[in-house]
Amino acid sequence: MEQSNKQHRKAKEKNTAKKKLHTQGHNAKAFAVAAPGKMARTMQRSSDVNERKLHVPMVDRTPEDDPPPFIVAVVGPPGTGKTTLIRSLVRRMTKSTLNDIQGPITVVSGKHRRLTFLECPADDLNAMIDIAKIADLVLLLIDGNFGFEMETMEFLNIAQHHGMPRVLGVATHLDLFKSQSTLRASKKRLKHRFWTEVYQGAKLFYLSGVINGRYPDREILNLSRFISVMKFRPLKWRNEHPYMLADRFTDLTHPELIETQGLQIDRKVAIYGYLHGTPLPSAPGTRVHIAGVGDFSVAQIEKLPDPCPTPFYQQKLDDFEREKMKEEAKANGEITTASTTRRRKRLDDKDKLIYAPMSDVGGVLMDKDAVYIDIGKKNEEPSFVPGQERGEGEKLMTGLQSVEQSIAEKFDGVGLQLFSNGTELHEVADHEGMDVESGEESIEDDEGKSKGRTSLRKPRIYGKPVQEEDADIDNLPSDEEPYTNDDDVQDSEPRMVEIDFNNTGEQGAEKLALETDSEFEESEDEFSWERTAANKLKKTESKKRTWNIGKLIYMDNISPEECIRRWRGEDDDSKDESDIEEDVDDDFFRKKDGTVTKEGNKDHAVDLEKFVPYFDTFEKLAKKWKSVDAIKERFLGAGILGNDNKTKSDSNEGGEELYGDFEDLEDGNPSEQAEDNSDKESEDEDENEDTNGDDDNSFTNFDAEEKKDLTMEQEREMNAAKKEKLRAQFEIEEGENFKEDDENNEYDTWYELQKAKISKQLEINNIEYQEMTPEQRQRIEGFKAGSYVRIVFEKVPMEFVKNFNPKFPIVMGGLLPTEIKFGIVKARLRRHRWHKKILKTNDPLVLSLGWRRFQTLPIYTTTDSRTRTRMLKYTPEHTYCNAAFYGPLCSPNTPFCGVQIVANSDTGNGFRIAATGIVEEIDVNIEIVKKLKLVGFPYKIFKNTAFIKDMFSSAMEVARFEGAQIKTVSGIRGEIKRALSKPEGHYRAAFEDKILMSDIVILRSWYPVRVKKFYNPVTSLLLKEKTEWKGLRLTGQIRAAMNLETPSNPDSAYHKIERVERHFNGLKVPKAVQKELPFKSQIHQMKPQKKKTYMAKRAVVLGGDEKKARSFIQKVLTISKAKDSKRKEQKASQRKERLKKLAKMEEEKSQRDKEKKKEYFAQNGKRTTMGGDDESRPRKMRR
């Protein structure tokens, strides 16, 4: 029989259950938390994650429009596949194959991102230290088949103390595992060990075998994607200093100097690279440090076109050009067809640029001597056949190669054609006969080049074109920009000009400065038409015109004398040579009538040039130098001096005529300004009177109150106000009690408030910078990060050029003003727990502090209850100590690490990082002392006085220590009185008790220890073998190298201590004293026996079997007693339990008796009556 099932019927109303649930309102209990514990754990985890994301707010100074490329360092032991990994990543990002990888390699990895790959030499500790300071991302390669090696752990510890960049682990050689289970176990072990060193959850990639010289494409794709989206946080040291990784360098030394002076002369070197960190000052003379070379001053710095721009930057340039074309077409009334650029979704192949000047990119290799082009092998098919050129490039090359005449033959008989319709000139006769001595006709610059004609030629007048707009001085190209042919063509064409002879304002002054002192003065006449027109304008210009001194002093193409001359309105002809040599500083001050004060110039300036002193004695000169009031009025205006100078002006009515009344040249009406200043002074006086009259508010001005004579209560109130102000400031800075004072604050947390402040300040700075011209911004801000620059250094050692190796990085770091100075640095230091030996004071130690690597002699110290700084001979175990060393100053809280050996030949199998620490104080006058014990012996003893010898060698030394505290070994304290006359070095001392001849007298003293001023920079890049730098060696190492024995001091040798046994005589009491003693205290002594007594003769001495038997019986009795005591204890415990049980039974029995009595009296009490005795007495109960 077939089974029949009931058909399912769907519910007609789906929300019926929900309607029934909410008929009586919302039921809160129905929606309670199902698992409160799980919810609490989830909230705790969310809070922990949010707290781990918080960091100290820091200013990110990286420019957003064109950031510098991120430095990706590939680090690992030898043979782990560093070169293969770089080759694979470059192939993935640029589709270019590199055969010889040397130096930095910059590639475009995204629309806004570039990467600079750098391979770290595996065997050079110096390169590891330098790369750890500049790397943004570290690809740490690990041999998965072998495990972690010493170089890996050393680099991680170095990076931890230099900012700790982002670290990605890459495990290689995993194809050598045959078993999958072993591979999984090895991966797990490597991952957890890597997490221990970096952080929990650090990413570790796995790369299998190599295919065709590269890693598998899928694995490299995953790694490159992870690198491209990684975010980097600014590090403190890099956020405060400019630095650069040089990608190439050039020797600019003139070959003639090398030939004449020899190969050992210092060189002029230019290095190229991208700037990172903060902006680098554009002024020459900026101090920088090249790691491995030394400190240098920047001789010249120039910004170059970016050799590897990002697509975003290129798109901005294209948009700028397109907008410019639109504006020009709109001005001409044309319709433009220029369209906007579409949004990029992916990189085109043409945008995947690569820049590696020291590697063989595209068959071109740039070396320090030449540029090498790979032309292929001989057995390959030739890519070029003469006569069968395939393009313009090949035609150009064949044209250059087919030389029929030499250079001398080509230029033989060739003349100079100045104009297109002119004839060639072979000779030029000197018709003008220029006088060498005249300053107008022959003016030469420092390099010996003539500046050309100074007078205006009459036939033609060339100047500024009419159709062009007025140019500003900031629109001129700088001296550092390269010269192009387009400018050549434009400047060579004659153009009509418009000359305004009536313009005498500031704008006209700017034009004159543009036309007379531009960079075209040093060029030839055909490029200097603006200068010639300006010379004519300069003669017709009014001398009374006021120049803008604020713009004149920033013109770098004129001298200070020219700046003063223009500001004073003088002409070249009216100024003789004596006026040029006058002191420039006195010319900055003018009287109201427009004349320059000549008091100081007339009397003293000429004498100073002749080196003739105008003071009779040195005392007069010192008095004049210390007199501040004599020159105070020269630098401060009347409104600034205030009330203090009113009495002086009243007492001396001629003071205005004596010192002159100065005017502000940038202000149009100085008299109105003086009136405004006087009004402001009166207002300030009224405010000060009101403030002083109010006693409650007077304590807020702490600086003014400290100068007054305050009572004790007023001082307490002022100190309390100071403390309250400091407490409030501390709470604001630390974020405590946030939102209590200001409840309407729009920020939820203090962290968001600080980030908003930083972003607001950055926005204000950017607005100010955008209002400036590019030249002004570069002068004030410097070359910002992301700029590709060329920096020239002079006096570089020739070994740097001779022994250059592109495999070792060249790192240039900028120095702050504090870091240029040298002094004593106090730091907190600890020996690394993996280093084998403890460190000894004054042993040389190579420190990596800031950009520098240098060798110094540290002294390890500790503090004794904050009273003295005591020297330690060795570093303590597992704890920090203080260290003082001489070296370059660095800001406090700067971490550093130290190593003892950097040469590979002296390195063993141990861990090389010897110490780590942090700077606490700089340039301190630290007083370090060490303990010194002087030992003496008494040779004459009186009651409380003794004569001591063998402690000092002369009476002078004793006089130095008069009054010093001394002490004996037995603890008797004393004091040094004075020296004795006859035995030299002996002295008299007083003690608190009589001492013995056997006592040793000790003087505890503290001897000052000075830090040795030893600074030896690690110049590893100057060596041919970069890994073999050896600094100051230890004495033991020198003796071992020279095969010398260690000299032995007999006093320092250890001997067996043989102490003489002391015999003490018995106490003898006189008989007269014994007779006076009471009977109880008398001394009872037996007289010595002449013969043996009975007890001595009959003494029982056990031996043999009897002794064994007695000892056996004793043991048996001991065991029996132990058993009896144990049995007694057991019986006592049983008796105790039985008594407890009996007490419980007795209690139960008494409880039953009570209940029976209660029940009996309750029943029989009803039968009694109030009357008769018979009825009141109870009846006898039957038995």
From Swiss-Prot:
Matching Gene3D superfamilies: P-loop containing nucleotide triphosphate hydrolases
Protein activity control: Interactions with RCL1 stimulates its GTPase and U3 snoRNA binding activities. RCL1 activates BMS1 by promoting GDP/GTP exchange.
Compartments in which it is found: Cytoplasm; Nucleus, Nucleolus
Region feature (Disordered): 1-39, 427-494, 639-709, 1123-1183
SUPFAM superfamilies (UniProt xref): P-loop containing nucleoside triphosphate hydrolases (SSF52540)
Primary location class: cytoplasm
Residue stretches spanning the membrane: none
Biased composition (Acidic residues): 435-447, 468-491, 653-697
Entry's Gene Ontology molecular function annotations: ATP binding; ATP hydrolysis activity; GTP binding; GTPase activity; mRNA binding; U3 snoRNA binding
Region (RCL1-binding) location: 536-559
CDD domains linked: BMS1
Phosphothreonine sites (modified residues): 504, 516
Cellular component annotations (GO), alphabetically ordered: 90S preribosome; cytoplasm; mitochondrion; nucleolus; nucleoplasm; nucleus; small-subunit processome
Region (G5): 207-216
Positions carrying Phosphoserine: 438, 478, 492, 518, 523, 574, 578
GO terms under biological process: endonucleolytic cleavage in 5'-ETS of tricistronic rRNA transcript (SSU-rRNA, 5.8S rRNA, LSU-rRNA); endonucleolytic cleavage of tricistronic rRNA transcript (SSU-rRNA, 5.8S rRNA, LSU-rRNA); endonucleolytic cleavage to generate mature 5'-end of SSU-rRNA from (SSU-rRNA, 5.8S rRNA, LSU-rRNA); maturation of SSU-rRNA; maturation of SSU-rRNA from tricistronic rRNA transcript (SSU-rRNA, 5.8S rRNA, LSU-rRNA); regulation of rRNA processing; ribosomal small subunit biogenesis
EC id: 3.6.5.-
Region (G2): 104-108
Stretches for region G3: 119-122
Record's keyword terms, sorted: ATP-binding, Cytoplasm, GTP-binding, Hydrolase, Nucleotide-binding, Nucleus, Phosphoprotein, Ribosome biogenesis
Compositionally biased region (Basic residues): 1-23, 451-461
Function: GTPase required for synthesis of 40S ribosomal subunits and for processing the 35S pre-rRNA at sites A0, A1, and A2. Controls access of pre-ribosomal RNA intermediates to RCL1 during ribosome biogenesis by binding of RCL1 in a GTP-dependent manner and, via its affinity to U3 snoRNA, delivering it to pre-ribosomes. GTP-binding and/or GTP hydrolysis may induce conformational rearrangements within the BMS1-RCL1 complex allowing the interaction of RCL1 with its RNA substrate. Required for RCL1 import into the nucleus.
PANTHER family registered for this protein in UniProt: RIBOSOME BIOGENESIS PROTEIN (PTHR12858), RIBOSOME BIOGENESIS PROTEIN BMS1 HOMOLOG (PTHR12858:SF2)
Assembly description: Interacts directly with RCL1 and the U3 snoRNA to form a stable subcomplex. Component of the 90S small subunit processome also known as 90S pre-ribosome that consists of the 35S pre-rRNA, early-associating ribosomal proteins most of which are part of the small ribosomal subunit, the U3 snoRNA and associated proteins.
Family: Belongs to the TRAFAC class translation factor GTPase superfamily. Bms1-like GTPase family. BMS1 subfamily.
Name of this chain's protein: Ribosome biogenesis protein BMS1
Organism: Saccharomyces cerevisiae (strain ATCC 204508 / S288c)
Gene for this chain: BMS1
